[in-house]
Amino acid sequence: MSEILEASHVYLDNPAKTVDEALEFISQKAVELGFASDAQAVLDALKARENEGTTGMMEGFAIPHAKLDNFSKVAVMVVKFAGDVEWETMDKKPIKVAIAICTPQEEKGTTHLQLLSEVAIMLTKESFRSDLLTCDDPEKLAAIVEGCFK
């Protein structure tokens, strides 16, 4: 499952302060990068998933994700925020990094679940979280996250 995350999919110092601002940014970038054709549909899917249950994890990370016919291929984006983002999380702490996963609807039971599982497992490792929080090089960040996909 290689090449679903490239350096051009990594964004540093994003100014978002709220989950809505973060999801809007991710939706726009999904269209700009050619993964989707309709930013509003992407945003609606991300918000619908968020309404089912927060994608905010622990220790400053979130895994916003959506499945949509609108997605042309599987894509992962990493967004590091300039400051704390208000996001409902399991530990009540703000988010510093979002790893967004976008998958076509037909891959909802396969690729989508596999990617979510692999990212969630890696986020349990302190070294992985630390590497993501301290690295400011898009190439290296892409390689770090890509490394968790088997």
Regions found by a protein language model. Give the residues of each.
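Cytosolic covalent-transfer regions centered on His/Cys nucleophiles
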Residues: 1-150
